[in-house]
């Protein structure tokens, strides 16, 4: 489950009209959400609030033998009026990453002014409004010692350029020396057709570059056909192929890093046709220096069911990795009835998906699925901005993943009254150091099954979120 501050930061990206999917860093987002999710390892309580449209706070308290916590503050120059902040109104799919639908590349529109007006109005506004560019400040203090302070600064320099600063400072207990700090600077440039990121870190003077190229029509040239490239993307495209890579170099430690990857995904236009396939995403990533290769396949089998798998292989060590996972969303009967009795935008029942595939007409299906967002697909859809007070249709989700070593993780996330609860368990082989002397004697006794005693619980935890 995302932290409340991460949820607010994603809302800032949406309000500033920045496409976070068009980045090499997000190449395997769907597979990571379905396969690499984490489970709580202790009891954790989060109290959050969006007290004003510009200011948010979060207080976290956790216990695992020792009590620790954190305090977070966030400020944005863009008012987040349409962002639900109450834990009973936040769409659960906004807090739980899952299958994310990629949309056709489009030219970034003019960003809104700090007073929340549209980009066109901001361009025609005063010079003072133009100088108030979208900015976000975020800081978190982790207590008790070792005290760690983390923070970030985001600023939209232009419709195609964004500046990102992140720092981390920590001080060991009883240390009289100055706290150690690391600063990471990123400049992101997005044209819709391609995206580039330039990075510098003060840790070993690390330099980096990331790039992503989308094959197909250039959204910057769509205006030659009389359309608006910012508001009329290539909706006729059925699929999208993207290629990218990243390279790092540190002159201090002489460290070099290199990776490249491909992503093929279906677009919303491919699911509008009754004879089309289900939404799916394929990725291939290579790390030549270490000899690692990884492929993923993710499929949205229904609006509430998604599968994903990953196979990794190293050509030097001949080691392999196989991981499979799935997520299943559940809708309560009360919310399901409310959904069917509401407007056609929300009237999507369990058979809509099948009717669309069979070519049958269904009045409940929206005529603009690429605008409203398909149900079950991660998208900043219409109902979040225009119906923020409606309960979300999906109120709980179950995630399960397993690898070739039988490491199993299971996660349940849903609402209990006014709380968002996340409960998870992790099972798998235990290391020899974690086995007690008594269990070792039991395993060596008569009738002991070889290796079975080393398999068991790894962690169990619950995380609770309340926001206002």
From Swiss-Prot:
Keywords: Membrane, Mitochondrion, Mitochondrion outer membrane, Transmembrane, Transmembrane beta strand. One of its GO terms (cellular component) is SAM complex. This is Mitochondrial distribution and morphology protein 10. Component of the ER-mitochondria encounter structure (ERMES) or MDM complex, composed of MMM1, MDM10, MDM12 and MDM34. Associates with the mitochondrial outer membrane sorting assembly machinery SAM(core) complex. Residues 370-394 are annotated as: Disordered. It is a multi-pass membrane protein. Component of the ERMES/MDM complex, which serves as a molecular tether to connect the endoplasmic reticulum and mitochondria. Components of this complex are involved in the control of mitochondrial shape and protein biogenesis and may function in phospholipid exchange. MDM10 is involved in the late assembly steps of the general translocase of the mitochondrial outer membrane (TOM complex). Functions in the TOM40-specific route of the assembly of outer membrane beta-barrel proteins, including the association of TOM40 with the receptor TOM22 and small TOM proteins. Signal peptide: none annotated. It comes from Ajellomyces dermatitidis (strain ER-3 / ATCC MYA-2586). Lacks alpha-helical transmembrane segments, suggesting that it resides in the membrane via beta-sheet conformations similar to those predicted for other outer membrane proteins and porin. GO terms for biological process: establishment of mitochondrion localization; mitochondrial genome maintenance; mitochondrial outer membrane translocase complex assembly; mitochondrion-endoplasmic reticulum membrane tethering; phospholipid transport; protein insertion into mitochondrial outer membrane. It is found in: Mitochondrion outer membrane. Belongs to the MDM10 family. Its main location: mitochondrion. Residues 370-386 have a biased composition (Basic and acidic residues).
């Amino acid at each position: 489950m995302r932290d409340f501050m991460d949820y607010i930061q994603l809302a800032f990206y949406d309000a500033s009209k920045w496409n976070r999917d068009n980045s090499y860093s997000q190449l395997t987002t769907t597979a990571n959400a379905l396969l690499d999710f984490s489970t709580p390892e202790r009891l954790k309580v989060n109290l959050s609030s969006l007290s004003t449209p510009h200011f948010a706070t979060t207080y976290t308290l956790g216990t695992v033998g020792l009590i620790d916590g954190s305090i977070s503050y966030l400020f944005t120059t863009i008012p987040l009026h349409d962002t639900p902040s109450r834990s009973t109104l936040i769409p659960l799919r906004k807090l739980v990453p899952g299958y994310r639908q990629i949309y056709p590349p489009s030219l970034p529109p003019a960003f809104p002014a700090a007073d929340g007006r549209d980009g066109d109005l901001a361009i025609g506004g005063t010079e003072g409004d133009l100088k108030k560019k979208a900015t976000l400040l975020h800081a978190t203090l982790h207590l008790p010692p070792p005290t760690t302070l983390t923070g970030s600064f985001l600023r939209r320099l232009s419709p195609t350029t964004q500046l990102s600063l992140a720092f981390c400072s920590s001080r060991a207990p009883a240390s009289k020396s100055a706290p150690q700090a690391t600063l990471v600077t990123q400049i992101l440039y997005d044209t819709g057709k391609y995206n580039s990121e330039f990075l510098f870190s003060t840790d070993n003077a690390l330099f980096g570059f990331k790039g992503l190229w989308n094959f197909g029509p250039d959204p910057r040239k769509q205006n030659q056909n009389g359309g608006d490239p910012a508001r009329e993307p290539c909706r006729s495209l059925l699929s999208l192929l993207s290629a990218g890579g990243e390279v790092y170099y540190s002159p201090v430690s002489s460290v070099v890093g290199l990776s490249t990857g491909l992503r093929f995904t279906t677009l919303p236009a491919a699911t509008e046709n009754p004879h089309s396939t289900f939404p799916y995403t394929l990725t291939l990533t290579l790390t030549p220096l270490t000899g690692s290769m990884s492929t993923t396949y993710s499929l949205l089998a229904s609006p509430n069911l998604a599968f994903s798998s990953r196979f990794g292989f190293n050509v030097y060590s001949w080691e392999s990795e196989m991981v499979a996972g799935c997520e299943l969303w559940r809708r309560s009967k009360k919310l399901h009835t409310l959904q069917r009795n509401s407007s056609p935008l929300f009237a999507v029942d369990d058979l809509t998906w099948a009717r669309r595939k069979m070519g049958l007409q269904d009045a409940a299906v929206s005529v603009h699925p690429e605008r409203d967002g398909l149900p079950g697909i991660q998208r900043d859809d219409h109902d979040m901005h225009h119906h923020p007070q409606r309960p979300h249709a999906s109120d709980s989700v179950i995630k399960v993943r397993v690898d070739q070593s039988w490491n199993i993780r299971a996660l349940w996330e849903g609402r209990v009254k006014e709380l968002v609860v996340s409960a998870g368990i992790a099972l798998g082989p235990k290391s020899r150091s974690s086995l007690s002397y008594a269990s070792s004697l039991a395993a060596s006794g008569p009738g002991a099954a070889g290796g079975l005693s080393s398999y068991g619980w790894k962690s169990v935890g619950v995380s609770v979120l309340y926001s206002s």
